[in-house]
Curated annotation (Swiss-Prot):
Function statement: Covalent carrier of the coenzyme of citrate lyase.
Cysteines paired by S-S bonds: none
Subcellular location: Cytoplasm
Keywords recorded for this protein, A-Z: Cytoplasm, Phosphoprotein
Pfam families registered for this protein in UniProt: ACP
Protein name as catalogued: Citrate lyase acyl carrier protein
Keyword Phosphoprotein: yes
Family, per entry: Belongs to the CitD family.
Main location as per UniProt: cytoplasm
Coiled coil: none
Source domain of life: Bacteria
Amino acid sequence: MKIVKESLAGTFESSDLLVKVAPADGKLTVVINSEVMKQFGHQIKQVVNETLAALGVQEGTIIVDDKGALDCVIRARVQSAVLRATDGQQIEWETL
């Protein structure tokens, strides 16, 4: 899935996160900022990377500002931000 424009999903509220997606040529860059990075940083990275892989995202810039979100919320916000950033023609709904 190709990211063609910038998009946002989520909020800065407690137990949520804000995901920012932007196009970038050549590589995938994921930046994660979290209040619970020491305790759950590995799990947050894993969920974000698995979600991006399932969507077929191979390049772009993904910035995650986490406020203690659960895994299901992380997946939903990443999916929403990526889908908003695509042209809508190449969505593979069965992967969601």
